[in-house]
Amino acid sequence: MPKAAASLASLLPQLWHRPVQPPPFLHRALSSSSPLLRRHRAALHSPAAPLSAAAVSTSAATVEAPATAAYPVYGRLLPCPLQDDPPRIEHLVAREDEVAVDFISRSLTLPPLYVADLIKFGAVYYALVAPQPPPHAAPEHVRIFREVTEPSVLCRRKSIKGKTVREAQKTFRVTDPNQRLEAGTYLRVHVHPKRFPRCYEIDWKSRVIAVTDNYVVLDKPAATSVGGATDNIEESCVVFTSRALGLETPLMTTHQIDNCSEGCVVLSKTKEFCSVFHGMIREKQVNKRYLALTTAPVSTGIITHYMRPINRAPRLVSEDHIKGWHVCQMEILDCKKVPWPSSLIRKVHKVDNCGWPQQEAAYECKINLLTGKTHQIRAQLAAIGTPIVGDSAYMTAAMAAIVNPSINPFGRWGQNYDSEDEKAAAVEAWISCHGKEPKSVIGLQASEISWDYEGEHHSYKAGVPWWRQDAVESDLI
């Protein structure tokens, strides 16, 4: 007879960017009248019973829905859907020694082949001990966490002997469906991984710029990920390029560009070169040039901002130095007037207009990237009122600042605030002006990359950017 699982939500702090109170239905689901939870308690307090399973369901922290939310019919992860399913992340603690695929399939009522696909995609993580609940977790969640991490329980775990609790709480990917799970092992299952359908539309061999003994240079298509997502390492540039070239050893990432950007990416063939290239990037020995299609002209010269040191979008930048914020610099080498992309080109490439009216002209900027912060070019150009065409995340904020310059608390016309609470509210209001991350392409290309290595100069250029392509020649029609 299958073992019972008791519901538990919100165990993992890193899944939430901002504190969100658990929806009311979670409290109902975890009430003491739940027969599922009563079985959980009985098993935990029975001297002969093994550690019970704690199943955590976090479909989406902000969704107001009944506890019995309707999920799609699960079969296989392929073929790839064109749209992502709503987020669904499940947290489990093994009740007894188990096989990963069997335990997940039974606990979440998922087909074993679907679970095996999730594991192949890198969407399943484990830790020897369940992580600490976030501060906003419900008391019931905290109670169950304490029960499964009781010192008297942990001291019987052979796998964690010699480890600190913090070490035992470190998560790793499950890589084998038949991986054995010791009783008490924690699992995080991303049931609906982020998908990248564009991967299946690309002629990957045609995107390869160069192949050497140490690396491959790829002209990365937009709407793809260089190395994959937290819950999907399968649909990525490294995997599809490796397959296209027939490589026995998969390529490795050396640096990143945004999913919505296109252009030059260096993928390493060996761990040694990967380490060398990382070192060259740290020492600023790798030169990167970009082309950006902006809504207005940008003056040549160096542009400096300071970026908030918080690792989530949107990336906020300030014209004034703020202690602890990271310096961001780029040099505008050239800016020329070009035709605004035609409606056909924008339709072919699925460019979001973001509510920005079509113009007669756009402006193509050649940029020398002096520092390499995430979203740096996009955030800096938006901050000076010249956002990148199609950038739904930052263009909406730029439009808001054009209408009301004082809305940006870090801009030139930012207000003085009487209290920290007032400033915090202004920052949240400014964040809310930003849109969602683009799902397709924006007017940004990593056009050139170069470096010196072992006495040789290496330099590569990407192809024609999408906004200059003839729609008839596009491979997307």
Swiss-Prot record:
Residues 1-52 form a transit peptide. GO terms for molecular function: pseudouridine synthase activity; RNA binding. The active site is at D258. It is an enzyme of class 5 (isomerase). InterPro entries: PsdUridine_synth_cat_dom_sf, PsdUridine_synth_RsuA/RluA, RluA_PseudoU_synthase. Transmembrane segments: none annotated. Residues 98-205 form the S4 RNA-binding domain. Coiled coil: none annotated. It comes from the Eukaryota. Its EC number is 5.4.99.-. It catalyses: a uridine in RNA = a pseudouridine in RNA. It is found in: Plastid, Chloroplast. Keywords: Chloroplast, Isomerase, Plastid, RNA-binding, Transit peptide. One of its GO terms (biological process) is enzyme-directed rRNA pseudouridine synthesis. One of its GO terms (cellular component) is chloroplast. Belongs to the pseudouridine synthase RluA family. This is RNA pseudouridine synthase 6, chloroplastic. It comes from Oryza sativa subsp. japonica (Rice).
